[in-house]
């Protein structure tokens, strides 16, 4: 199976390349692309790690050589958030980058599963869908917004707060991938009892965790290492699914439109990408209200992406 990483010279991309070289199944191929001339060097560097994963690096304006015969494409290209910016400030730059790359995906590997990491994910996934649709190759089972970092953060913070073994914690996170659209379903976490005054602050911390990192890095970037681990976890689950195993991950996909055209929720991954979108389950009163409150924001984010391509 061939996995292409677009944006492989960036903070997320380099760490993601390392994690995939270490963890992809033997016999996999890893293809790294970035506009930056350092990219073949990143591939050379990572290639010295002794695992049975072949790796190649490509630089320059044209991602097509990196995309040929790809089964999975992960897009992390774009600019990172700096203090004072929110994810929507990234839109003006990253929207064009994602559009251009997806046009090349549509031409070169239209049947590949595509995972969008580039923020604002709520919007960039809609851009990708519209570009693929215009090219006549859109298959909603094969397009994903990678929201796994919200799950990782939720698992970490719940374990810390409750003094639990983090490996036993699973937290479904639904909605979108910015601010109020991130909704961890804490009421569904096993082995935990919640006090009234714990839920709202913890939810807010999960929603604002990206900003926490941006501020802590003091202008030196945004969450890259934890994001790379999240993307690696998602990519490895996707590869398992494509290989015929049953795996469930929360991810931002086009479903039945019950809440919004794109919505993050638990998804069973399989040989065609999305095998089945699973129900969100029973929500607490707090979660139900948070869900209703976020929908106008989420729908507006999606519409922004659709209009970017169609107007």
Swiss-Prot record:
A family per Pfam: Ldh_1_N
Binding site for substrate: 81, 87, 119, 153
InterPro entries listed in its UniProt record: L-lactate/malate_DH, Lactate/malate_DH_C, Lactate/malate_DH_N, Lactate_DH/Glyco_Ohase_4_C, Malate_DH_AS, Malate_DH_type1, Malate_DH_type1_bac, NAD(P)-bd_dom_sf
Reactions that this protein is recorded to catalyse: (S)-malate + NAD(+) = oxaloacetate + NADH + H(+)
GO biological process terms held by the UniProt record: malate metabolic process; tricarboxylic acid cycle
Cellular compartments per GO CC: cytoplasm
EC number: 1.1.1.37
Enzyme class at the top of the EC tree: oxidoreductase
Presence of the UniProt keyword NAD in the record: yes
Residues reported to bind NAD(+): 7-13, 34, 94, 117-119, 227
Catalytic residue list: 177 (proton acceptor)
Molecular function per GO: L-malate dehydrogenase (NAD+) activity
Keyword terms: NAD, Oxidoreductase, Tricarboxylic acid cycle
Subunit-structure text: Homodimer.
General function of this protein: Catalyzes the reversible oxidation of malate to oxaloacetate.
Alphabetical list of PANTHER family matching this protein: MALATE AND LACTATE DEHYDROGENASE, MALATE DEHYDROGENASE, MITOCHONDRIAL
Family: Belongs to the LDH/MDH superfamily. MDH type 1 family.
Protein name, per record: Malate dehydrogenase
Source species taxonomy: Bacteria, Pseudomonadati, Pseudomonadota, Gammaproteobacteria, Pasteurellales
């Amino acid at each position: 199976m061939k996995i292409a990483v677009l944006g492989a010279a960036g903070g997320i991309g380099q760490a993601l390349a390392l994690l995939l070289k270490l963890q992809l199944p033997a016999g996999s191929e890893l293809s790294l692309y970035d506009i930056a001339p350092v990219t073949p060097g990143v591939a050379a560097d990572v290639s010295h790690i002794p695992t049975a994963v072949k790796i190649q690096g490509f630089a320059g304006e044209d991602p097509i050589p990196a995309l040929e015969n790809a089964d999975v494409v992960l897009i992390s290209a774009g600019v990172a958030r700096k203090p004072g910016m929110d994810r929507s400030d990234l839109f003006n730059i990253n929207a064009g980058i994602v559009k251009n790359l997806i046009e090349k995906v549509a031409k070169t590997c239209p049947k590949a599963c595509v995972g969008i990491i580039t923020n604002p994910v709520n919007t960039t996934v809609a851009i990708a869908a519209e570009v693929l649709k215009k090219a006549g190759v859109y298959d909603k089972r094969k397009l994903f917004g990678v929201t796994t970092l919200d799950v990782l953060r939720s698992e970490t913070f719940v374990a810390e707060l409750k003094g639990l073994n983090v490996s036993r914690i699973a937290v479904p996170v639904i909605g979108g991938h910015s601010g109020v659209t991130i909704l961890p379903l804490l009421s569904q976490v096993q082995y935990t009892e919640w006090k009234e005054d714990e839920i709202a602050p913890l939810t807010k911390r999960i929603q604002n965790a990206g900003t926490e990192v941006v501020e802590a890095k003091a202008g030196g970037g945004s969450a890259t290492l934890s994001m790379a681990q999240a993307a690696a976890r998602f990519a490895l689950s996707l590869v398992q699914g494509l290989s015929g195993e049953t795996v469930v991950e929360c991810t931002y996909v086009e479903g039945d439109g019950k809440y919004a055209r794109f919505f993050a929720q638990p998804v069973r991954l399989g040989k065609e990408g999305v095998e089945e979108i699973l129900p969100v389950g029973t929500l607490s009163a707090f979660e139900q209200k948070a869900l209703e409150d976020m929908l106008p924001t989420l729908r507006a984010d999606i519409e922004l992406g659709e209009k970017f391509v169609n107007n």
